[in-house]
């Protein structure tokens, strides 16, 4: 189940598993309480593709787009928009790549990217190292050697998150969690496209990544914000 908050005059973007975008206005969807209606009645979804995500924002809003293949780029909301029922190709991906939900960017200059692979490698780098594109594959986010991309259990990019300046990065592995504050994050910080650093052995199988905001006190010391008071995740 996926939902978004929007206004009746705002466009809604639907992204499918093949990286295509489709557009509808929210007022064209049923407003009464019901099970809804099939999107295929309005949009020509490509064969063998399924709708994965919904977006709605102002035209000049920026997003981080990427896939499990380890590539990504920055894109404006207006570049997802299309008037054609067949949609348009936005993200180019290999056959087995999985599309990540695009992440809304608040500060292109200050925000960072946190990338975690399926083998427990973490790389943090400045968001502005990625290009602005209207469509395409993007640039390499994290390096995964070709030999690691083969076999029964190939290494892929598993999590891709926007990491604001004053936030903890919390790595979950089952019942265990590793909290990296802004100071500790430096150990995993590098340049875009590098290999990243392996997490401690207990956290190699990452099951969830959480962004935890800090509240800066008068003495300049950061304090973790109660999750109930935060909308970041």
Which role does the model predict for each range below?
Residues 1-233:
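Short, structured "edge-of-domain" segments at secondary-structure transitions
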């Amino acid at each position: 189940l996926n939902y978004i908050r929007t206004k009746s005059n705002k466009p809604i973007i639907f992204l499918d598993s093949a990286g295509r975008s489709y557009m509808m206005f929210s007022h064209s969807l049923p407003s009464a309480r019901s099970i809804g209606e099939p999107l295929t009645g309005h949009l020509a979804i490509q064969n063998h593709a399924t709708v994965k995500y919904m977006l709605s924002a102002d035209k000049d809003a920026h997003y981080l787009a990427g896939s499990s293949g380890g590539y990504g780029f920055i894109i404006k909301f207006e570049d997802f928009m299309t008037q054609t029922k067949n949609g348009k190709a936005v993200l180019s991906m290999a056959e087995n790549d999985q599309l990540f939900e695009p992440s809304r960017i608040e500060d292109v200059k200050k925000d960072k990217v946190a990338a975690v692979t399926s083998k427990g490698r973490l790389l943090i780098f400045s968001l502005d190292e990625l290009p602005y594109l209207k469509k395409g594959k993007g640039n390499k986010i994290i390096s995964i050697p070709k030999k690691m991309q083969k076999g029964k259990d190939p290494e892929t990019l598993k999590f891709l998150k926007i990491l604001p300046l004053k936030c903890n990065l919390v790595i979950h592995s089952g019942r265990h969690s590793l909290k990296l504050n802004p100071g500790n994050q430096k150990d995993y910080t590098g340049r875009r496209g590098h290999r990243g650093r392996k997490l401690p052995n207990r956290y190699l199988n990452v099951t969830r990544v959480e962004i935890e905001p800090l509240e800066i006190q008068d003495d300049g010391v950061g304090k973790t914000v109660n999750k109930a008071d935060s909308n970041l995740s």
